[in-house]
From Swiss-Prot:
The lineage of its organism: Viruses, Duplodnaviria, Heunggongvirae, Peploviricota, Herviviricetes. Residues 1-15, 85-96 have a biased composition (Basic residues). Residues 1-100, 133-159 are annotated as: Disordered. It comes from the Viruses. Residues 16-31 have a biased composition (Basic and acidic residues). This is Protein B1.
């Protein structure tokens, strides 16, 4: 164990003595690699990264000229507005499918009941349903009771 350490030391000493600027430069990446800084941080910081020249010259005044601002305004995209057609349907997770929205849907014929949870793509407006016979406010309850009463005879009146 000690022998190994000794040989390592002598090797280092030999390398240090015969150092030329070229070998020094060659060794530098190896030395920085052993440092404890994570590679992402190391890559960003330090003089090794070439400094990109800024858009403005250093001695120029800081305020922008009118021509520069107009050029900038052209470059900036207009505020994002989702298209009137193509609605996002939520599937499991964060993925979304786009579905063509029908003209009726755009004009507001369908109910607000079309939420991301409903499996049916389209529903008829609740007001329209309430007008139709057998589709009133408690239609589902009534139909359920009707189905049950058809199966067995009506119960005897209470005494």
């Amino acid at each position: 164990m000690q022998k190994n350490m000794k040989t390592k030391k002598t090797k280092k000493r030999g390398r240090k003595e015969g150092n030329t600027p070229e070998t020094e430069r060659r060794m530098e990446p190896a030395r920085s690699r052993t440092s404890a800084i994570p590679s992402g941080l190391r890559r960003r910081s330090g003089p090794s990264t070439p400094l990109r020249p800024g858009p403005e010259v250093r001695h120029a005044p800081t305020w922008r000229t009118a021509s520069a601002t107009t050029a900038d305004s052209h470059r900036i995209s207009p505020p994002y507005t989702p298209s009137s057609r193509g609605r996002h349907i939520h599937t499991r997770g964060a993925r979304t499918r786009t579905r063509e929205t029908s003209a009726a849907e755009i004009n507001g014929v369908y109910a607000r009941a079309v939420t991301r949870k409903t499996k049916r793509s389209e529903t008829i407006d609740r007001l329209l349903l309430s007008v139709l016979p057998g589709h009133g406010p408690h239609a589902s309850l009534r139909s359920h009771l009707r189905a049950r009463s058809a199966l067995r005879p009506p119960p005897d009146p209470p005494r």
